[in-house]
Amino acid sequence: MADLTKLVDELSSLTVLEAAELAKLLEEKWGVSAAAAVAVAAAPAAGGAAAAVEEQTEFTVVLANAGDKKIEVIKEVRAITGLGLKEAKDLVEGAPKPVKEGVAKDEAEKLKAQLEKAGAKVELK
């Protein structure tokens, strides 16, 4: 039990950026997505079949490849996400990675166009 208390204390002392990075690392390690878990938990049990027929309303903008203009893509990723230079560079170099999750279709298409204009290959999921 003392180990769990120590772990809770350490997690409580993380900054927001450190907590976000921890979430990304855990998603990669366990092969899950925090956004998907929230969507599944929020879906009603009886309306599962009806929800599958409805059009997708939330999208994840995924950077598939940075292309040849990596610096331009890093600048766009920073502008879109508000990440620092190192975090944006790590995201671009670690492609394929999600840039933004849970966005509306029109915003997702706008972000895709921005990133593609900078030279990136982008997917919407």
Swiss-Prot record:
Gene: rplL
Thylakoid is among the record's keywords: no
Keyword Ribosomal protein attached: yes
Protein keywords: Ribonucleoprotein, Ribosomal protein
Gene3D superfamilies named in the record: 3.30.1390.10, Single helix bin
GO molecular function annotation: mRNA binding; structural constituent of ribosome
GO cellular component terms, A-Z: cytosolic large ribosomal subunit
Organismal lineage: Bacteria, Pseudomonadati, Pseudomonadota, Alphaproteobacteria, Hyphomicrobiales
Quaternary structure and partners: Homodimer. Part of the ribosomal stalk of the 50S ribosomal subunit. Forms a multimeric L10(L12)X complex, where L10 forms an elongated spine to which 2 to 4 L12 dimers bind in a sequential fashion. Binds GTP-bound translation factors.
Pfam families per UniProt: Ribosomal_L12, Ribosomal_L12_N
Name of the protein this chain belongs to: Large ribosomal subunit protein bL12
Organism (species): Azorhizobium caulinodans (strain ATCC 43989 / DSM 5975 / JCM 20966 / LMG 6465 / NBRC 14845 / NCIMB 13405 / ORS 571)
Family in the record: Belongs to the bacterial ribosomal protein bL12 family.
Database matches in PANTHER family: 39S RIBOSOMAL PROTEIN L12, LARGE RIBOSOMAL SUBUNIT PROTEIN BL12M
GO biological process: translation
Function: Forms part of the ribosomal stalk which helps the ribosome interact with GTP-bound translation factors. Is thus essential for accurate translation.
